[in-house]
Amino acid sequence: MLAKRIIPCLDVRDGRVVKGINFEGLRDAGSILEQARFYNNELADELVFLDISASLESRRTTLEEVLKVSGEVFIPLTVGGGINSVERAREVFLHGADKVSVNTAAVKEPELISRIAEKYGSQAVVVAIDIKKVDGRYIVHTHSGKQPTAYEALEWALKVQELGAGEILLTSMDRDGTKEGYDNDSLALISTAVHIPVIASGGAGSLEHLYDGFTKGHADAALAASIFHFRQHSIREAKQYLRDRGITVRL
């Protein structure tokens, strides 16, 4: 059985790590480099760097920040925010990213997924899907969750898989920052329908929530921010907790 992954996420805005609730009310969560170094030494399996305002404000992810982070970590680094072309993806890879995460641009131009995958391989393409429950349906949103789309979550997940995505980063906007646990219903819906890895995101507030994301949501990886950024729990502690309960992790 493949080991389940624990992935801390650096939501970056104006050169700082931030964290909000339901994509709003951002508060400072520290220095980008300090957090990156910390997670590199904490047995994180990967690190995600998301410039959360890049697409919203139509500006590009700061390549200098990506370069600094990539020089500090020796674990796979996924970078997202404002990646709207193959050339932009190339720049991010040249600055040290191992994977790129596309979201808003992929909904606008789905073929972007295929073009990046054809050039760099599916393993280098993560499609971030932000969903919100609307009238009982999971609706995909873009522009940092500000704009609803015509896509339902399952429909879009199957489409991005077909287009060549190597992973799906599924974020519940309803749970984001709430520490109430992942939306395991939507996770299970997507995880059991696709054959590519699904990363759980949005709502982790305890070690039990990580466990539930793997066992109830059938996620392949768990992304978290609040519980790690503010040192509520360590990644080592989380992995030991999971291992003690029969989940295969790297320790």
From Swiss-Prot:
Q: What is this protein called?
A: Imidazole glycerol phosphate synthase subunit HisF
Q: What is the lineage of its organism?
A: Bacteria, Pseudomonadati, Chlorobiota, Chlorobiia, Chlorobiales
Asked whether the keyword 4Fe-4S is assigned, the reply is no
Q: Where is the signal peptide?
A: none
Instruction: List UniProt keywords, sorted A-Z.
Output: Amino-acid biosynthesis, Cytoplasm, Histidine biosynthesis, Lyase
Q: Which reaction does it catalyse?
A: 5-[(5-phospho-1-deoxy-D-ribulos-1-ylimino)methylamino]-1-(5-phospho-beta-D-ribosyl)imidazole-4-carboxamide + L-glutamine = D-erythro-1-(imidazol-4-yl)glycerol 3-phosphate + 5-amino-1-(5-phospho-beta-D-ribosyl)imidazole-4-carboxamide + L-glutamate + H(+)
Task: Please provide the Gene Ontology terms (biological process) for this protein.
Answer: L-histidine biosynthetic process
- Tell me the organism: Chlorobium luteolum (strain DSM 273 / BCRC 81028 / 2530)
Name the enzyme's class: lyase
Enzyme Commission code(s) on record: 4.3.2.10
List the Pfam families hit by this protein, alphabetically: His_biosynth
Q: State where the protein is found.
A: Cytoplasm
The UniProt entry, under NCBIfam families, shows:
hisF
Q: In which pathway does it act?
A: Amino-acid biosynthesis; L-histidine biosynthesis; L-histidine from 5-phospho-alpha-D-ribose 1-diphosphate: step 5/9
GO molecular function terms noted in the UniProt entry: imidazoleglycerol-phosphate synthase activity; lyase activity
CDD domains recorded for this chain? HisF (cd04731)
